[in-house]
């Protein structure tokens, strides 16, 4: 089965939120190629200090010598390599039309461009917080940087975007906007975890039970003891199923818990505290761990075979190494 590949790129003016968007992608487990790193690496190779002036000079020279799509061309081999392993790659830092056209030529309909819009004044306020060595020191410098990038076709590149995200509200609102759009575009499994801490239970043990199965879980606890968590890595869950040799049971539970693009299973909380998986009913004593897998751009059959493939004589008939 050939799965859809996806290259998701961010374009925007300096300090509009591209780096934040890239960090959201990393938190979702998506690999990120930072186009600006090509310029920073070239400047470092030349022994130059990483100032805005030096980086601008290096970027300009690369484009004059190798074409306006020079930086994009240098990124493509790395993107292709990451696509082989992950299926989805996020690109941070498109600066002009030529780069968009180069990526479209290389990846066709698998290339998606997201524009981030943010006013000049808001962007300058972020300079003071980011404190990066190559940042501008005044709003006039930022305007000059805008003009420089516009000369490369930045404004036209933003007009070519498939999606536009406004970054004018709170940091949390922007992060959630980016997270939602990436989840829709990327091959991804979002894992929602719910349970309850009863008066007779230890909070530490309940949290340990969850993280024994999903180590990357981000967990919140309400005053009433309701536990909500979100995770993205399936590695430990898969590992334990194979270690315990319960793939047939897991496959059955996944099939039973399927509802469209979601799969819900219930895990025994007590056995999870010792890093063991034991499936149970929804109404189990002391509230089980309810796990819901939301499939984004992943066929259910692929997810099923990746987590719990069919077996023969207790061994997987065919293992799938990646989604």
UniProtKB/Swiss-Prot annotation:
Classification of source organism: Archaea, Methanobacteriati, Methanobacteriota, Archaeoglobi, Archaeoglobales
HAMAP family (alphabetical): UPF0200 (MF_01111), UPF0201 (MF_01112)
Binding of ATP, residues: 12-19
This protein's UniProt keywords: ATP-binding, Nucleotide-binding
Chain positions covered by the region annotation UPF0200: 1-185
Stated family: In the N-terminal section; belongs to the UPF0200 family. In the C-terminal section; belongs to the UPF0201 family.
GO molecular-function terms, A-Z: ATP binding
InterPro entries: NTP_hydrolase-rel, P-loop_NTPase, PAB1135-like, Ribosomal_uL5_dom_sf
Record's protein name: UPF0200/UPF0201 protein AF_1395
Region named UPF0201: 186-323
């Amino acid at each position: 089965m050939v799965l859809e590949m996806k290259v998701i790129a961010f374009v925007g003016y300096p300090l509009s939120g591209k780096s934040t968007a890239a960090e959201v992608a990393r938190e979702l487990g998506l690999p990120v190629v930072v186009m600006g790193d090509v310029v920073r690496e070239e400047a470092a190779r030349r022994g130059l200090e990483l100032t805005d002036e030096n980086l601008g000079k290096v970027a300009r020279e690369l484009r004059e010598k190798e074409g306006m799509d020079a930086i994009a061309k240098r990124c493509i081999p790395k993107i292709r390599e990451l696509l082989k392993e992950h299926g989805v790659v996020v690109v941070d830092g498109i600066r002009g039309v030529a780069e968009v056209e180069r990526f479209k030529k290389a990846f066709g309909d698998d290339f998606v461009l997201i524009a981030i819009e943010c006013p000049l004044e808001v962007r300058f306020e972020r300079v003071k917080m980011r404190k990066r060595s190559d940042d501008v020191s005044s709003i006039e410098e930022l305007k000059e940087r805008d003009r420089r990038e516009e000369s490369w076709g930045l404004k036209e590149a933003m007009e070519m975007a498939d999606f536009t995200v406004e970054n004018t509200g709170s940091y949390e609102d922007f992060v959630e906007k980016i997270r939602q759009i990436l989840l829709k575009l990327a091959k991804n499994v979002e894992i929602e975890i719910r349970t309850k801490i009863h008066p007779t239970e230890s909070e530490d043990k309940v949290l340990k039970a969850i993280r024994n199965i999903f180590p990357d879980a981000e967990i919140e606890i309400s005053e009433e003891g309701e536990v909500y968590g979100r995770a993205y890595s399936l590695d430990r869950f898969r590992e334990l199923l194979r270690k315990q040799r319960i793939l047939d049971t897991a496959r059955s539970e996944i099939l039973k818990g399927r509802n469209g693009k979601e799969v819900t299973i219930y895990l025994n909380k007590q056995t999870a505290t010792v890093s063991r998986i034991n499936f149970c009913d929804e109404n189990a004593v002391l509230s089980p761990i309810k796990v819901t897998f939301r499939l984004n751009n992943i066929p259910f059959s692929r997810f099923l075979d990746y987590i719990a493939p069919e077996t023969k004589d207790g061994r997987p008939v065919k293992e799938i190494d990646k989604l």
